[in-house]
Amino acid sequence: VPQITNAVKLAAEKVLKKEPMVLGPGVKTGLNILMDNPGQLGADLVANAVAGIHEYSLPLAIIDMGTASTVSVVDEKKHYVGGMIFPGMGVSLDALTARASQLSGISIEAPKRIIGKNTIECMKSGVIYSNAAALDGIVDRIEEELGQKITVVATGGLARKIIPHCKREILLDEDLLLKGLLIIYEKNRKEL
């Protein structure tokens, strides 16, 4: 989060007596970012993509399901070619419960059946299966645009709840971000 990066960096420097590495422009990643403004690409997306190119077959789509859901696309030449951002499952559920007075907060877990028999089941089914169907459709459209099949990997706090309900094969890697940060650190540590 850009607003707190500098404060955290200064605090880490003070405590550790070393300058921390901050993932951003100028840090070696091995990733060629083909975006209109590569510097705007979030460090989390860069780290995920770096781990993805080291761990999985290319081309690749990485779905990160957190507050926002993101999809990052890496082609067979290790180029980060773009992606998409859409409201995360928790944000969608919060908006639904805040705007519809009859609907209360629920836990995010799959109901026993897709067709709900009460309000809570209907909300759970809607949240889980609409997200799963969206991911299936997004992957189909990415493959159509690229003209080839892709490997799909999901990560992030909510991926485990949705991926089992997708029809597409989507691999789950909950440590993808940390793997990417380690790879980037190893590429740059000689210079620190």
What is each PLM-predicted segment?
Residues 47, 67-69:
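Short, glycine/acidic-enriched loop or turn micro-motifs at the edges of active sites
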Residues 1-61, 76-192:
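Nucleotide/phosphate-binding catalytic cleft detector across ATP-hydrolyzing
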Residues 62, 69-74:
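Short beta-strand scaffold segments in enzyme catalytic cores
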